[in-house]
């Protein structure tokens, strides 16, 4: 008879969890940041709020965002005027929209990732789906399983309402699933649509206005598994370790509340300061076991909560400007897509490394770090190992 220990040993993979494919998708509707203040104040019937509009213009100018993608078109907003008010009852309209669109956008990214992976989707054993947009039972994980035609026995995990740190969370979960289930192939999907947070401007809630200037829609998908099949599955990054922590003295720094008016956000001004003040502790805990203390020797993938966070982290750690290039590029081209952002940055980094003829997927370097920042204030830290190109 087999012992429990023997059975458990046979269940475990031998090598580290590995990202084997990445796919991304956005809605078709592209919004230029330079034109957005005029559009936003017009569509929300707020053009009389001239001082507030000037403030919003300055926010958009400082955002370092060039364009974003949004499911909400002018036509949709005209059909749903309560979405354009500051706090009108609108949850039903928002939910009805996103419970359909979030899995659909997730399917686009997942289809690309599965195609790059090159294996039949019947080999997918687990699905991790993450969104801050829309809640139903059965959830977006079930809807995506149906849309993709995955096996009914796929083991699903649905993550709702995590916020911007969750791109790190899904990697942590996928790593544990892949390494503790021999032969597992985990489809990870983050799909975010801002229809839950869109609302008109108000003088008393400027942090909501910050969100209107930063957030965009997008979905990203990965295939994660251990022990890639040689010549068949092509590793992109290895997931070496993953940690999560709540920053000290950060209660209420980032809050989100899903109510009748939709999802409202509250941000304290000191969010960039809280993150930059505590980030070195997370780095030390993650990299001390590897004997690494030079943060410029790493490749960097940081959730781009906004330019102020990136600037303060860069300054605090004396990072070279090029360290956050991929992060700033994704912020510029897509805005803040919450949980999907860091997965877009992984894709951008490996793409640029191939384009520039570098010898690893991590900008020619061996080790890297991925950070997720979000409500809590919660920080996810993932240690990455690059792969030779």
From Swiss-Prot:
Stored Pfam families: Chal_sti_synt_C, Chal_sti_synt_N
The cross-references to InterPro entries, in alphabetical order and at most eight, read: Chalcone/stilbene_synt_C, Chalcone/stilbene_synt_N, Chalcone/stilbene_synthase_AS, Polyketide_synthase_type-III, Thiolase-like
Among the GO molecular function terms of this UniProt record, one is: naringenin-chalcone synthase activity
Q: Does the keyword Acyltransferase apply?
A: yes
PROSITE patterns in the record, alphabetically? CHALCONE_SYNTH (PS00441)
Q: Which UniProt keywords apply?
A: Acyltransferase, Cytoplasm, Transferase
For this protein, the Enzyme Commission number is 2.3.1.74
Tell me which residues this entry annotates as catalytic.
Answer: 164
Which SUPFAM superfamilies does the record match to this protein?
Answer: Thiolase-like
Q: Where in the cell is it found?
A: Cytoplasm
GO cellular component term of the entry, any: polyketide synthase complex
Annotated catalysed reactions: (E)-4-coumaroyl-CoA + 3 malonyl-CoA + 3 H(+) = 2',4,4',6'-tetrahydroxychalcone + 3 CO2 + 4 CoA
CDD domains, per this entry? CHS_like
Summary of the tissues where the protein is detected: Expressed in glandular trichomes. Detected at low levels in female flowers, stems, seeds, leaves and roots.
Please name the GO terms of the biological process aspect recorded for this protein, alphabetically.
cannabinoid biosynthetic process; chalcone biosynthetic process; polyketide biosynthetic process
Q: Does the keyword Cell membrane apply?
A: no
Q: What is its main location?
A: cytoplasm
Q: Which family does it belong to?
A: Belongs to the thiolase-like superfamily. Chalcone/stilbene synthases family.
| Biological role | Chalcone synthase that can also use isovaleryl-CoA, isobutyryl-CoA or hexanoyl-CoA as substrates, but that is unable to produce olivetol or olivetolic acid.
| Protein name, entry field | Naringenin-chalcone synthase
Q: Which organism is it from?
A: Cannabis sativa (Hemp)
Q: Which gene encodes it?
A: CHS
